[in-house]
Regions:
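Non-catalytic, conserved peripheral segments adjacent to functional cores
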Residues: 1-105, 124-126, 136-182
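Extended, polar beta-sheet/loop recognition surfaces of beta-rich domains
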Residues: 133
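Conserved metal-binding segment of the jelly-roll/cupin
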Residues: 102-124
């Protein structure tokens, strides 16, 4: 397993090391002890899965405190452009975003800590995405930021989106409850 530190502190790309033989493939995709040495929260509470069609955009979502959560995002079928936005006040990367392709082929997982908004665009006809979360869903703390309000070029003119996501507030009007901690 290989862990890559990404350009925004706190984000990690986790890539398994598959071992193949005549039976097929075996690989480790989660290692709580190893992840904890990198400061990742490994106290998992819920797993969600989505199936999305090409040019669907979901996001940008997060949960507010006291039910904020970290996520481990991976793709089981197809491919997505995964996007994260730093919404931690006083962070040197506050307001910066990062995008990375996750796919069934590369088998990578993106670790997203608390204090980030998350979304993605489906790149294939069908993308099956899995989220492991460190807190249970809480409707009262469910929040988001409008997908095109922070400078991300999504590369699609008419994305397929939920009415909820279309109505999310702009990043410029968002007052973050998250703070950066060294």
């Amino acid at each position: 397993m290989h862990i890559t530190t990404l350009d925004i502190p706190g984000l990690f790309l986790i890539t398994p090391t598959p071992r193949a033989d005549v039976r097929g493939v075996f690989q480790k995709t989660f290692d709580a002890a190893l992840f904890a040495t990198h400061g990742m929260n490994t106290d998992l509470h819920e797993v969600f899965e989505t199936e999305s069609h090409k040019e669907v955009i979901r996001g940008m979502h997060f949960q507010m405190p006291p039910h904020a959560c970290a996520k481990y995002v991976s793709v089981k079928h197809g491919s997505i452009l995964d996007v994260v936005l730093d919404i931690r006040m006083n962070s040197p990367t506050f307001g910066k975003h990062l995008s990375i392709q996750l796919s069934a082929e590369n088998q990578s997982t993106l670790y997203i800590p608390e204090g980030f908004a998350h979304g993605f665009k489906a790149l294939t006809e069908l993308a099956h995405t899995s989220y492991l979360q460190t807190a249970g869903f809480n409707a009262a703390c469910d929040a988001g930021i409008h997908f095109d309000s922070f400078g991300m070029d999504w590369g699609v003119d008419n994305p397929i989106m939920s009415e909820r996501d279309k109505a999310l507030p702009a990043f410029t009007s968002f007052i973050s409850p998250f703070s950066h901690q060294e």
